[in-house]
Amino acid sequence: MEVGRVKRVAGPVVQAVGLKASMYDLVLVGEEGLMSEVIGISGDKHIIQVYEDTSGIKPGEPVKETGGPLVAQLGPGILTQIYDGVQRPLPLLAEKSGDFISRGLFVDGVDHKKKWEFKPLVKKGDTVKPGQPIGEVQEQLLIKHKIMVPPKHKGGVVKEIYSGNFTVEETVCVLEDGSELTMLQKWPVRQARPVVRKLPPTIPLRTGQRVIDGFFPLAKGGTAAIPGGFGTGKTVMQQTLSKWSDVDIVIYVGCGERGNEMADLLHEFPELVDPRTNRPLLERSIVYANTSNMPVAAREASIYTGMTTAEYYRDMGYDVLMTADSTSRWAEAMRELASRLEEMPGEEGYPAYLAARLADFYERAGRAEVLAGGEGSVAVVGAVSPPGGDFTEPVTQNTLRIVKVFWALDSRLTQRRHFPSINWLDSYSLYEKDLESWYAENVAPDWNQLKRRAMAILQENAELEEIVMLVGSDALPEDQQLTLEVARMIINFWLAQSAFHPVDTFCPYKKQYDLLKAILTYRDYAFDALRRGVAVDQIKSVPSKDALAKLRMVEDYEPDLKKVMDQMKAEFEALK
C-alpha cells in the first residue's frame, strides 16, 4: 500500500499528497494512525476528513492507505453493544484508554475471540444463493441471528457445512468452488444493502403513544421527522419510541447530542423491560453514542454505520427501528466541513448537497422483500433541532420534502406541560390512507370515523379559542361552549400522556379506541341534554367526567370503564 504525506491541516480536514486511494477509502493519518476517510481528490491531492482529534498533526506526517472504504463489521454479538460513531465498542475503548478515548485506537466492532454455537440450516449438496441463511446463532434469548451468504457473493453448491462452536472468523461452510463462508460480514457503510423489491407500507408501527397511533401513524418501513426547538421533548420522544415500538431490533444513534443525555439513556436501557417479551430492552438494542464533544466528522459515519446495521437485521427478516438524534447536528458537521473545504455555501451556509445527503439516508428506509425470501423493514425517525424552533430553516425544510410523517413539537404545548408536545394541527402523516384498512380490520371498524370526528372537534376548538381570547367563553353560544369542553377532554384525557407513569407511558390500541369512544359518547350525551334544555354548567359538572380522566392511568381499565359509562348514562338521564 502507498504511504503519502500530510501537506495541510485545517481542523478535521487534512490535505495529503502521494496517495493512490479512491473516493471514500479509509486511510490512517499521522504517526498515531488516526482513522480517516478520503472525501475529495484533486490532481495529486487527497482531501481527507479525520474521525478523531487532529491536534498535534503536522505537515510531513505519514498517511497510510488501507485499500478499502469504511466498513461495518456485521455478525453475532453486535446486539446490546454500545459503540462510538465508527463502530468501536465503548466499554473496550474504556478498558484500553480509560474514560477519555485516546487517539489511534483500533477495536473490532464484533468480538473475534468469542465462540458462538452455529446451527446449520442447509445441508451438503444444497444450492445457496446471495442473502440466503446457511445457519443461525442464538444471539439473545429471543433473537436468532441468521448467518447469510454475503449479498455480493455469487453463491453455489454446499461442499461442507459444519455444526458446533466457532468464532466469527472461523469457516462454517465451504462451497464447491472452494470459497469459505464465516459468520462475519463486512459492508461499506455508504452503500445500501440490496433487496429483491420494496413493498408498500401497509402495516402500522405501534408506538403506544395515543397522539401518534391515533392521529399521525408511522408505518413499518416508514420515515418520520421530529422537529422541535430546545426543550420540546425530542430526545424523550425518541427514547419512548425506542422503548415501546413493536419492532424486533432498535438502533439508537445519538449523533452530536449532549453527553449527559446519552449517559441517561445508557443507564436507563439496561433496567427497562420490553412489554412484549418481559426481557431487558437492551437485548434488542444497539446504541451508537457519538456526543457533541466528539470529532464532527464521525457524526456522518455514525448515521451511515447505524443504517448499515439496520439493513443487516432487515435482511434477516426482522422489523427494525432506527432513531437518529439529531440529524441537525450531522448537517452542522457537513456545514463545518464544507466551509473548511472552501465549497460554495448554499442557504444559511449549508452545502448545496445537503438535500441529496438527507435523501440518500432516508431513502434507505422501507419495507422490503429480502434476498433470503420473506419480508423485513427499516423505519427511520430523525430528530431535527432547528435553531429557535424555526421550521423554515433548510434542514427542516429539506427533511420534510423526503419524510412522510411530520410530528411538529410545539414549545407552547411544552410551556403548558402538555407532553408529548406534538401539535395536532401542524403535524401530518401521509401513511393514513394506506393504514386505514388495517385499523378497520384489527382495531375497530369505526376507528377511522372516530379519529376524524375527534380531529374535527380539535380544529373547531382552535377557531373558537381565538374568539375566547377576545370575549371569553361565556359569550359563546352554549353548543360552542360544549365543543370547547369536549376538545379540552380530548386534549387533556387522551392526547396528553406521561412518559414517566408506569401505565400511561404505553397505551395499547384497544385502550386508545375505548377512551376516545368514551369521550365522544360524552359529547353525544351532552348535546342531547342541551337539546332537552339542560344548562351547560350542569352538563359540564357531571361526576363521571372526572372518573373518565383517571382511566388512562389504570392498567386493568375495562371493568372501571364500564362502570363509568353506566354512571354517565344514568347521570345524563337524570339531568332536567
UniProtKB/Swiss-Prot annotation:
UniProt KW rRNA-binding keyword: no
SUPFAM superfamilies associated with the record: C-terminal domain of alpha and beta subunits of F1 ATP synthase (SSF47917), N-terminal domain of alpha and beta subunits of F1 ATP synthase (SSF50615), P-loop containing nucleoside triphosphate hydrolases (SSF52540)
Any one biological process term the GO annotation gives: proton motive force-driven plasma membrane ATP synthesis
Binding positions for ATP per the UniProt entry: G228, G229, F230, G231, T232, G233, K234, T235
One GO MF term attached to the UniProt entry: proton-transporting ATPase activity, rotational mechanism
Enzyme class: translocase
Keywords: ATP synthesis, ATP-binding, Cell membrane, Hydrogen ion transport, Ion transport, Membrane, Nucleotide-binding, Translocase, Transport
GO cellular component, one term: plasma membrane
Cellular compartments annotated: Cell membrane
Catalytic reactions of this protein: ATP + H2O + 4 H(+)(in) = ADP + phosphate + 5 H(+)(out)
Domain of life: Archaea
Enzyme Commission no: 7.1.2.2
Membrane topology (UniProt): Peripheral membrane protein
Entry-linked HAMAP family: ATP_synth_A_arch (MF_00309)
Binding partners and assembly: Has multiple subunits with at least A(3), B(3), C, D, E, F, H, I and proteolipid K(x).
Biological role: Component of the A-type ATP synthase that produces ATP from ADP in the presence of a proton gradient across the membrane. The A chain is the catalytic subunit.
PANTHER family (alphabetical): H(+)-TRANSPORTING TWO-SECTOR ATPASE (PTHR43607:SF1), V-TYPE PROTON ATPASE CATALYTIC SUBUNIT A (PTHR43607)
Family recorded in the similarity comment: Belongs to the ATPase alpha/beta chains family.
Protein name stated in the entry: A-type ATP synthase subunit A
Species for this entry: Methanothrix thermoacetophila (strain DSM 6194 / JCM 14653 / NBRC 101360 / PT) (Methanosaeta thermophila)
